[in-house]
Amino acid sequence: MGDPGPEIIESVPPAGPEASESTTDENEDDIQFVSEGPLRPVLEYIDLVSSDDEEPSTSHSDENFKCKDYIDHQKDKVALTLARLARHVEVEKQQKEEKNRAFREKIDFQHAHGLQELEFIQGHSETEAARQCVDQWLKMPGLRTNAANSGTKRSFQRGGRMWRSEKPILCPIMHCNKEFDNGHLLLGHLKRFDHSPCDPTITLHGPLANSFACAVCYEHFVTQQQYKDHLLSRTAAADGHSNSLLPQIIQCYACPQCFLLFSTKDECLKHMSTKNHFHQSFKLSDNKGTARPISFPSFAKKRLVSLCKDVPFQVKCVACHQTLRSHMELTAHFRVRCQNAGPVAIAEKSITQVAKEFIVRGYCSDCNQVFMDVASTQSHKNSGHKITLANSVEESVLLYCHISEGSRPPCDLHLFSQPKISSLKRILSVKESSAEDCIVPTKKVNLGVESLGGATRVQRQSPAVTAWFCECRRQFPSEEAVEKHVFSANTMCYKCVVCGKVCEDSGVMRLHMSRFHGGAHLNNFLFWCRTCKKELVKKDAIMAHITEFHSGHRYFYEMDEVEEEEEEAMPSSSVESHLNTDKPPSPIAVVDHCPANSPPRGRWQCRICEDMFESQECVKQHCMSLTSHRFHRYSCAHCRKTFHKVETLYRHCQDEHDSEIMMKYFCGLCDLIFNKEEEFLSHYKEHHSIDYVFVSEKTKTSIKTEGDFKIVETSSLLSCGCHESYMCKINRKEDYDRCLPVLLEKGRLWFRCSSCSATAQNVTDINTHVCQVHRKEKSEEEQQYVIKCGICTKAFQNTESAQQHFHRKHAALQKPTATPGGANRSSTCQLAASASHAEKNLKQPSSQKHSDVEKGAEHDVRCQNIEEEVELPDVDYLRTMTHIVFVDFDNWSNFFGHLPGHLNQGTFIWGFQGGNTNWKPPLSCKVYNYLSRIGCFFLHPRCSKRKDAADFAICMHAGRLDEQLPKQIPFTILSGDQGFLELENQFKKTQRPAHILNPHHLEGDMMCALLNSISDTTKECDSDDSSGMKGSPAEELRATEDVELEEAIRRSLEEM
């Protein structure tokens, strides 16, 4: 309230005892109010008491008035709020009653309409009746195919109308012409990158209405019963009609000029009128009438769609005509390079060109011949045969479908003629098998080779088991195993079309597509031959490529192997073929099936990537192409950083150098920098395009003297391809030179800078780093880098020491050839026992005692630290995971049995066992089977018989992965040992989120929830479940996260 003013204050008598005395002396009628200023409304008043006994209390009465006024105001406010809420509830109740009433009316209407339709379709077939019901339902008021009804209040607008979507969105790629109802569908289409202009179904919407056509007289019928009546009436005419003549089901209509498909004839006519497509692309008669929609049978529609899908297409830039192979590449191109241009889709054929296959001029049913032109039709008609003619495109399509469905494949038309692609499986003929005195195999597909010799000699005994053999004579227990071996031996893998990464497992590739490319590219990968650098789309095509261009592992076959001779024949043959895997097959083991076409004794090798080629032309083309080798080609003139792609250089200059682009050309093979692209290309052509050599094969089929005999190493092969011990220094140098780049490429060995934490996979990169970054610190007297082991991270001063360390400590023996029976495997060290058995059969005389002693010593160590034939999980594959769990099966062997459900996707389980524990996989556990099937479980080879061997292995591999994996991937160790707490403290120093869980203190559901919460990036701690558990793992986990948070805050404050 405002200030009452001086005039009102003056009229108030003073307070206190003096005021009371003066008030009693004066008369009430003598009181006057004097005002000097302008009149104002009276804001306060004085309660005048008539009684002399009562004392006026101005302040007390004013306080009571204010309090009463405030309470009344609050009461009125509450009353208004309650009234407003009551009205709101009443309105909602009325709306709900209206919705319920409308829903009941709709249900009653549908029920009545359904009863009416059931009476109408009693005489129709089930399929036709169901289709009519769907058509009638779509015509009803209410739900629509182009309307959105989410069940919320937005669906019901004023007047009970339903919200409808806006105008369909057109794909921004030119010539794609696909439309979508909303942006989400368009985004999925863009990610799938299916912009083929040769797609006749883009205008095919809604249900397909069936009608029936006669393939003899080309008449159309609405129902199937009318067609049957037509056949009964025309059977006696003997003009081709018969009771067995199947009708052609008309499901859609095609535009006569562009052959786009439409659900109804009205839609097709509307399209023809809009596009002015009243001209026929194929004229089969002189009739000059107006073109009309072509009735397209179901068989022709499926055939046209299938042929159009096989038509390759490309998406190119309108400005620079660069081919764009993915949505990611397209987006990056138009963001960096051609910002004012657009993409266009180009197909090798148009729909009209594909539809030309349906054009047939005549058909003779007597001799089953098809005629494609008028001359051949008339010539054959003169012979007296009755020919069915097609005078329009519609009649030609009906005749085509009648011929194709009547005889597959047709004799002359070859409608389904596809390239004869051979399978990898062969079937031996009876003549060949009898000539070799062996049992006739059950399967063998002929690939154009007339004779197949060298089959395994097996006597006709029983019982027999089925086995699969590769061309290299290795035996496998299943067809999947031998096919996987053929793919691996021929360097076949899968290549991602989006980013170009390669992988040997299709499951890993699909996981890569799902994780890194949004899930829309699950099938957007190709088959890639690393030897020939060739991309093929289909699996059958890659098989044909293996058969034509490769040798040694081109096929496999199936045979009935005698069970009795398995123990005698298989160990020696398996070891022999095992030792000769990387060498040309012996003439005793495998006979050359095509000696006339056999390649020369030698191959060409590229010195840059060490890939081998069959001819000089192939290796020359490989070296001439800049895309064959991946190296840095561009350099920033500001900071001398190098890049693979020019787009990356542009982004670098925009971010780091204020969009000032200064580019130079850099040769990553020899570290030279050029100012112009012509100089770089000239340098590459002169020096690197001819960097290949011819590698001759020393082995010969006929050996005349002992001097011509090459020393054959008889020791066992290691997992890297080298031998366990060598008798010849030349063989050792060759194998080590071949093995070292492979170890560096796979990350088994790597270079580490001595001055900083930089790493590299080859000498060139580490030397470049030392020269550019540590120019001032470089000294010729001391080495600026060390070579570290990728498994135990031990450092060495030279590559030879590091390679020898890897062979001694981490290279396991290769697994011998798989046999169905698996004889002589009683030892717990299966691989070492099998390898020693092979050495026993193939060992040379006792002149090699020194090598035997060395081999025996290494063999004893390997029996304790043996790694099976499988390699450790690939680091690139582990980078795709969201959680790495190390399980100590010595402490908790029933890990999978305690899990109540599946773990989150991206959780990788790495199991360890040691001591006397003999952990067996729970084959009946669904969680274990699922993780094994998707490749998210790996059982580490038995460490040793020491009690703490598994703990040491966990620490070693966890430390190795901590250096190689991104820091956001958490590690969890499931073990009851308290020694891992120190490992957790070490991980804190490296900023790695790590958790140590004791499985003995956790229930299965609690542990599963903890593991899933760790892998979830948006996890929140469940404080309710763990509030009463004092000292529980959940509290330890929460405390650990608090400590990490405090440490991060402290570190950030120090930096500030």
UniProtKB/Swiss-Prot annotation:
CDD domains: PIN_ZNF451-like (cd18721)
Protein name: E3 SUMO-protein ligase ZNF451
Annotated Basic and acidic residues bias: 849-858, 1033-1045
Protein function: E3 SUMO-protein ligase; has a preference for SUMO2 and SUMO3 and facilitates UBE2I/UBC9-mediated sumoylation of target proteins. Plays a role in protein SUMO2 modification in response to stress caused by DNA damage and by proteasome inhibitors (in vitro). Required for MCM4 sumoylation. Has no activity with SUMO1. Preferentially transfers an additional SUMO2 chain onto the SUMO2 consensus site 'Lys-11'. Negatively regulates transcriptional activation mediated by the SMAD4 complex in response to TGF-beta signaling. Inhibits EP300-mediated acetylation of histone H3 at 'Lys-9'.
Domain of life: Eukaryota
EC numbers on record: 2.3.2.-
Modification type Omega-N-methylarginine: residues: 158
Short motif (PLRP): ranges: 38-41
Taxonomic source organism: Mus musculus
Coarse class of the protein's main subcellular location: nucleus
Post-translational modification summary for this protein: Sumoylated. Predominantly sumoylated on the N-terminal region that is important for interaction with SUMO1 and SUMO2. Sumoylation is important for localization in nuclear granules; desumoylation leads to diffuse nucleoplasmic location. Autosumoylated (in vitro). Sumoylation enhances E3 SUMO-protein ligase activity.
Protein's pathway: Protein modification; protein sumoylation
Region of interest: Interaction with SUMO2 1: 30-37
Residue span of region Important for ubiquitin binding: 1045-1056
Compartments, record wording: Nucleus; Nucleus, PML body; Nucleus, Nucleoplasm
Sufficient for E3 SUMO-protein ligase activity, as annotated region: 1-246
Placement of covalent cross-link Glycyl lysine isopeptide (Lys-Gly) (interchain with G-Cter in SUMO1): 704
Enzyme class, UniProt record, top EC level: transferase
Molecular function terms from GO: DNA binding; SUMO ligase activity; transcription corepressor activity; transcription regulator inhibitor activity; zinc ion binding
